[in-house]
């Protein structure tokens, strides 16, 4: 190592810049991946909250006393899209590929993609698109 540092041919400088470049590249990749996971978690939380709210808001209350739970599936589909569009932050876009549900048992599942800006997007027009699947169900758990 000492001989490499005393070498006047410049190989230590080239080695230093090569290692510095590799370290910076690794740092940027770690930061980008961390930012991507943070954005994905934020979008996933909003979508899950939206589908939970859609199921709860569209439960048919007429039969609840008899422990019969029914879901207005069409209303829940519309509510999910409205809740998600209202809560999604600026710069995020989501597309719904399919929303399926059943009235009894009350269950709703949505699949699609969400797109958000990359961490280093100011240095280029880049965005990241990931898929999502969210599911919500409503079951009686009062034990009667």
Where are these regions (language model features)?
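Short, conserved structural patches
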Residues: 60-144
């Amino acid at each position: 190592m000492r001989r490499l540092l005393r070498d006047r041919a410049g190989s230590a400088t080239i080695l230093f810049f090569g290692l510095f470049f590799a370290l910076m590249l690794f740092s940027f990749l770690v930061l980008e991946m961390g930012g991507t996971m943070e954005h994905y978690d934020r979008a996933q939380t909003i979508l899950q909250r939206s589908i939970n709210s859609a199921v709860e808001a569209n439960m048919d209350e007429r039969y609840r006393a008899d422990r019969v739970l029914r879901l207005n599936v069409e209303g829940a589909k519309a509510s999910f899209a409205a809740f998600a569009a209202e809560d999604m932050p600026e710069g995020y876009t989501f597309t719904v590929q399919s929303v399926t549900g059943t009235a009894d048992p009350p269950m709703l599942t949505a699949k699609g993609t969400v797109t958000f800006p990359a961490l280093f997007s100011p240095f280029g027009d880049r965005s990241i698109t990931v898929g999502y699947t969210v599911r919500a169900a409503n079951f009686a758990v009062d034990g009667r």
